[in-house]
Amino acid sequence: MEAIFEAKGVTKYFGGLKALDRVDLTINRGEIISLIGPNGAGKTTFFNCISGLIAPDEGQISFKGHKISGLKPHKITRHGISRTFQNLRLFAEMSALENVMVGGFSRTKTGVLGAILKTRSAVQEERWLSSKAIELLEFVGISEHRDNWARNLSYGDRRRLEIARALGSDPSLLLLDEPAAGLNPRETQQLMNMITQIRDRGITVLIIEHDMKVVMGISDRVIVLDYGVKIAEGLPTEIKKDPVVIEAYLGKDENVRQDA
């Protein structure tokens, strides 16, 4: 397998708190990896380090052989990494189509001035963005809402739109932060199908998720964090039976344990 992502010794402090403690992770092209652990384990902090919202204090993150730790988010997006957020970050008073087009703007070359002046290249790129956005809305199953404001969509459809927006930048690695949060069982199954279809499009996926049915159902490997430390890594069947994981996470929550 070809490794496209590597984190070595990633450490992050917030004051006197060590939120991440020398976390190592290698991701191979085409994998679906789940990152699990109790609340406060450092999962979102790790995502934030990868996507450039914060910089690690120690260690290094590389993608496709290039160091990306410490880069600004827009530069990391240009390298081919995109993400969603647990708390949806959509433009409420923009249409679903426009939200996805914004997601793809990082791939354009015209720039803001060209867009304002409506240069020929800007018009061509806008047409390309619109066509790409329509295809992605069809892919996630909400193309009929393309002209609706994001705030008027149902919660489940806003979740789908968030994924379409992230796909708009044409990523090689997609980070999904609790994509199943708040979804009903039917929507959750549809999400699982969608994630495997995303992988089939050649996109590697790293997921933070608490729903063990999702984790165990679609993951190639599972990584477990606890208090900022990676305590386990393995196949879903291995993680499910790991006594350290059961003690630290699965065994703490009756609902989680039953779902697993």
Q: What are these language model-derived features?
A:
Residues 1-260:
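Glycine-rich phosphate-binding loops of nucleotide-dependent enzymes
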